[in-house]
Amino acid sequence: MLYPEEFDVIVVGGGHAGTEAALAAARMGAKTLLLSHNIETLGQMSCNPSIGGIGKGHLVKEVDALGGAMAIATDEAGIQFRILNSSKGPAVRATRAQADRVLYKAAIRHRLENQPNLSLFQQAVDDLMVEGDRVVGAVTQVGIAFRARTVVLTAGTFLDGRIHVGLDNYQAGRAGDPPAVSLSARLKELKLPQGRLKTGTPPRLDGRSIDFSKCTEQAGDGMPGGAGPMPVFSFMGRADMHPQQMPCWITHTNARTHDIIRSGFDRSPMFTGKIDGVGPRYCPSVEDKINRFADKESHQIFLEPEGLTTNEYYPNGISTSLPFDIQYQLVRSMPGLENAHILRPGYAIEYDYFDPRELKSSFETRSIKGLFFAGQINGTTGYEEAAAQGLFAGINAALQCRGEEAWLPRRDEAYLGVLVDDLITKGVTEPYRMFTSRAEFRLQLREDNADMRLTEAGRKLGLVDDARWDAFSRKRDTVSRETERLKSIWVNPRNLPAAESERVLGKAIEHEYNLADLLRRPDVNYETLMSLDGGKYSAGSPLSEIEIEQIEISAKYSGYIERQHDEVERAAHFENLRLPADFDYSQVKALSFEVRQKLDKHRPETLGLASRISGVTPAAISLLMIHLRKGGHKAFNRDAATEAAAESQPAQ
């Protein structure tokens, strides 16, 4: 049957990528359909019950700054919040939250069901409708054909998924859900380059059988015994949105645990060749950890509550595909878990992914127009990476329906830009996870300023509603106004008593400074600075903690950030210069055969993307630029002229 309505955007899959893709496209006015094999699992946290972390929290904040759902859903569902790296610089501080699975899923579903321009439909997709070189819709398992101008595929671990527990294995998308075998076969027919990856999950435990007196309590920020204040994830969030807070607990593996794990190596699918897919380097299975770090006597295991209305606990750190009898023994070998009852066995899952180097910068596939990929299908791991990709693909699918150019954030603008750029230029050999270390401009890509970097762009795209825009505008204007006020107030040895200077600054000042300069000093904060000379320099109206934080960080890191801006500008002269789609790299005789081969294979859209392909040297980029300019290629020279004209314009 051909469904009587046609859509602008069809999103296949209702996980973290799919929900953000559907919400983004619909917010932009595209008539959107979200197809899921089970509406009850929309927004489900398939593995760990947490959101955020180093690098990941930055992505969540960016999704939020663009109007996405993940951060605000976490504020409504979070049962423990912590700021990681709180003693380090602001660039690497990151928010992490434990979430109640039921509350999180409900928060996401509520937004999906109440989003204008978005329809939901429960059916697994078995086929894509392709006419010529363009996708025109999707077909479900009962033969319902939905036509659309674009399709965003967010299939997660479902593509030809196979679960492994010991030497036993069976087809599944995740525990309790069927795999997408027909869809996987259809994608292989389309000759899209694919591979296999794997991920895993630990056994779940019944909290009633855990002896917490033998474990170490880990309180969240804002809880008794924790640091404070209690964080929020969304720029529109408040601490009073959070439900009841709960502690996590810490136990450890030991020599006996390790011996038990080793005794199961001969029945491990990892070590017997049953699993071909590569697992995530930074979230290895417990058997992989024991094998790789044989000299380590113990590993921390975090016991994380799954929610407020369940006794289920997630033992973070023992993801495993070992046989169940080994899982049973290894769990009971740890302090506090001697009598632990396993509710669900751990398992590994293998699934298809597709080489992200075959995607355009917009995440549209090169070979099939209108078909976008997002999430684990691109070789990534993690809820946060999936959500960011989904939002990005949803934006660009909607823009294509409008006939507009794709939105492409740069590496110096967003972690989302780093994520996209890494995937399409470097590809993956293992599941990709975001870290702050992947961003060369991380001083300006902080959690605290994600809205300052992206909300204006989100407003122009149609992603940001009036309430968020008004809140952002007030914050932006307040920070700007107060920063300028601090720059305009000057103090010197004559008008600032020495005793006051020593109290706030640690020593008397020797010449004239403005207050912004004084705020740059490491030991000076805004609050103490405003107490100078009886508070005569304080602002007329009080500022929020968030506004003060933004002012302080901007002042203290201004020198470093200015240097990073200079680096960005030096690279910008070729970053966005577009390469002709039909360019023949064999014409550039001075390029090595290897470089010509790689450029011809990847067909980078800009010189910046070309420069980040493995094996393409700076010298090769210079040769390419010289050849294009000498050759007088119209498209290239037009872009170069546009860039030069833009650079010559005075700042507005």
UniProtKB/Swiss-Prot annotation:
NAD-binding protein involved in the addition of a carboxymethylaminomethyl (cmnm) group at the wobble position (U34) of certain tRNAs, forming tRNA-cmnm(5)s(2)U34. Keywords: Cytoplasm, FAD, Flavoprotein, NAD, tRNA processing. It comes from Variovorax paradoxus (strain S110). The gene is mnmG. It holds the Pfam family GIDA_C_1st. This is tRNA uridine 5-carboxymethylaminomethyl modification enzyme MnmG. Homodimer. Heterotetramer of two MnmE and two MnmG subunits. Its cofactor is FAD. GO terms for cellular component: cytosol. GO terms for biological process: tRNA methylation; tRNA wobble uridine modification. Belongs to the MnmG family. The lineage of its organism: Bacteria, Pseudomonadati, Pseudomonadota, Betaproteobacteria, Burkholderiales. Its main location: cytoplasm. NAD(+) binds at residues 279-293. InterPro entries: FAD/NAD-bd_sf, GIDA_C_N, MnmG, MnmG-rel, MnmG-rel_CS, MnmG_C, MnmG_C_subdom, MnmG_C_subdom_sf. GO terms for molecular function: flavin adenine dinucleotide binding. It is found in: Cytoplasm. FAD binds at residues 13-18. The keyword Ligase does not apply.
